[in-house]
């Protein structure tokens, strides 16, 4: 199957899975260290009310100037960065509450705590998130799954999906999964599809697993199955073991690709000022 067709199939699989997850609780096989458990959302992670709109209404003229941020050949758009700030806003508040016992939203985003400034921490965290996201898309570009890693292309694909779903629904067709996406839900949807397409193809780098590798990984972890006492035999969880191995290998590939995106020379001071303007 051509790679673009594999990616399209993965997109469809993610859409169907989204429907199933709403109605089913699946707990057949679990990884002993919790790898199969869905990650919980930390307290306050969804809170982004403290991030200003992208109109600059709460920022000074100087802080409203978004600096030029480039990852390789890709320019990071202002809207993309602001969305990343919103996504990491809750994590920043949680980190400073747990580490220093302060809430930046109340104590101030520009007040240093043992050398760490919440505003700068948040900006760095947002950039790290964007590095990982673009790394995943660049892997998809290498395999011909997407044309490029630009935010404009992502938005265009989202709009095409939304338009196609709306047209199908108006014609009486059945839309499996979400009928419409905002940018956050579409990013999650498409990044999952990219990962599924990559890990589902054994010919991709890092996805070929030897029997010895599978056995070693199985031996190093606990595997349980409903109705089975003790550790489940390898033959009964081999598929899950391989899936987990490929998932971890893919995540490591993304991490390595993200690390290769050099941000040393980014205009950090200007970015901090812009970020402070969003939090003002």
UniProtKB/Swiss-Prot annotation:
Signal peptide range in chain numbering: 1-37
Entry's localization field: Secreted
The protein's name in its UniProt record: Chaperone for lacto-N-biosidase
Domain of life: Bacteria
Key words of the record: Secreted, Signal
Binding partners and assembly: Homodimer.
Cellular component GO terms held in the UniProt record: extracellular region
Protein's job: Chaperone required for active expression of the lacto-N-biosidase LnbX.
Species for this entry: Bifidobacterium longum subsp. longum (strain ATCC 15707 / DSM 20219 / JCM 1217 / NCTC 11818 / E194b)
């Amino acid at each position: 199957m051509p790679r673009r067709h594999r990616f399209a199939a993965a997109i469809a699989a993610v859409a169907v899975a989204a429907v199933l997850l709403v109605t089913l609780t699946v707990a057949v096989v679990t990884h002993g260290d919790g790898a199969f458990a869905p990650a919980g959302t930390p307290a306050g992670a969804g809170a982004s009310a403290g991030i200003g709109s992208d109109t600059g209404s709460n920022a000074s003229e100087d802080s409203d100037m978004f600096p030029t941020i480039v990852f390789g050949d890709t320019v990071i758009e202002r809207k993309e960065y602001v969305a990343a700030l919103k996504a990491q806003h809750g994590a920043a508040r949680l980190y400073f509450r747990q580490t220093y016992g302060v809430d930046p939203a109340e104590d101030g985003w520009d007040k240093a705590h043992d050398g760490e400034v919440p505003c700068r921490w948040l900006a760095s965290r947002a950039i790290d998130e964007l590095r990982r996201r673009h790394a995943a898309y660049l892997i998809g570009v290498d395999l011909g799954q997407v044309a490029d890693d630009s935010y404009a292309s992502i938005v265009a694909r989202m709009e095409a999906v939304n338009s196609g779903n709306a047209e199908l629904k108006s014609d009486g067709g059945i839309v499996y999964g979400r009928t419409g996406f905002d940018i956050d839900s579409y990013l999650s949807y498409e990044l999952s599809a990219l990962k599924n397409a990559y890990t589902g193809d054994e010919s991709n780098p890092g996805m070929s697993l030897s029997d010895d590798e599978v056995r070693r990984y199985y031996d190093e972890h606990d595997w349980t199955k409903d109705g089975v006492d003790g550790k489940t035999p390898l033959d009964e969880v081999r598929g899950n073991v391989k899936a987990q191995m490929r998932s971890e290998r893919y995540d490591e590939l993304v991490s390595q690709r993200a690390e290769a995106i050099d941000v040393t020379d980014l205009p950090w001071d200007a970015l901090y000022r812009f970020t402070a303007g969003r939090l003002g």
